[in-house]
A protein has these predicted regions:
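Loop-centered beta-sheet repeat module
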Residues: 168-227
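Blade-loop segments of beta-propeller domains
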Residues: 40-111
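Short loop/turn segments immediately following beta-strands, especially the blade-tip
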Residues: 30-37, 80-87, 126-136, 184-192, ...
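Asp-box/WD-like beta-propeller blade repeats and closely related beta-sheet repeat scaffolds
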Residues: 88-161
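Beta-propeller fold detector
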Residues: 39-47, 89-96, 136-146, 194-199, ...
Length: 244
């Protein structure tokens, strides 16, 4: 196809407590024809356990995937090289998630650091990434604390995402279990995460995902347990978030 775009789809391959079925095969590659809208599966799936969240680096050279596994020792993060012509993935390496139910991965703009959120154990990790895309062992692991009023979903901390500020100086982890956004300073040269502050949100709200406005100092937060979008101000100098 002359005018196409490649899509990567992660699937659940193993059952987890929140799933009724898990019939997937791994990561699937599709080609989308931008002229006709036709979607075509381009290859056999890449075999990996529960690649429930995928992230591609800014220049499109690497794809990173979580393996969302409840067992602490089996979950992980994996790196793949992307063929620029075919979109095919080539496995590079994997590292342990250092927690259970890894659910979110993000990459800084230079591709030198990968950030991972573990929902089950409520912690976040950072991993240095080499020039060839190889993941090193985690350079930082931070355990969240706290709980919320929803006894079924908030019995403990549950880190649900970790995203970077537009300038990549700060990282923000939305913790569904503790009703907090935990902020960190990121040192991209070492992959270190330094805890800064915790923004306490409405009790029982269950913050899940955070995105920044592309040109303004605002962020938008989705709170899963109350189905709400919250507008936040962002101080690019200090990294502080405030509810508006």
């Amino acid at each position: 196809m002359s005018n196409s775009q490649y899509l990567y789809v992660g699937t659940y391959t193993r059952l987890a407590p929140h799933l009724e079925a898990a019939n997937g095969s791994g990561i699937h590659l599709y080609a989308l024809d931008l002229d006709t809208g036709a979607l075509r599966c381009n290859s056999e799936p890449i075999v990996i356990d529960n690649p429930s969240y995928l992230s591609i680096d800014k220049i499109g050279n690497r794809l990173f995937s979580v393996s969302e596994i409840e067992q602490h020792e089996e979950g992980g993060i994996s790196a793949y090289a992307i063929d620029p012509d075919s979109g095919a993935l080539t496995y590079i390496n994997s590292q342990q998630a250092n927690g259970s139910a890894a659910c979110y991965v993000s990459i800084n703009d230079t591709g030198s650091t990968a950030l991972l959120a573990n929902y089950g154990t409520g912690n976040v990790c950072s991993y240095p990434v080499a020039d060839n895309g190889e993941l090193s062992v985690a350079s930082a692991i931070h355990q969240h604390q706290g709980s919320g009023p929803n006894s079924e979903r908030q019995e403990a901390a549950h880190a649900h995402s970790i995203v970077l500020s537009p300038d990549n100086k700060f990282a923000f982890a939305a913790d569904l279990g503790s009703d907090q956004i935990i902020s960190y300073q990121l040192h991209s040269d070492t992959g270190q995460l330094l805890p800064l502050a915790a923004l306490q949100l409405q009790a029982g709200s269950g913050p899940r995902h955070l995105v920044f406005h592309p040109t303004q100092n605002f962020a938008f937060l989705i709170s899963e347990l109350i189905s709400q979008v919250t507008l936040l101000s962002y101080d690019a100098t200090s990294g502080e978030l405030r509810v508006l």
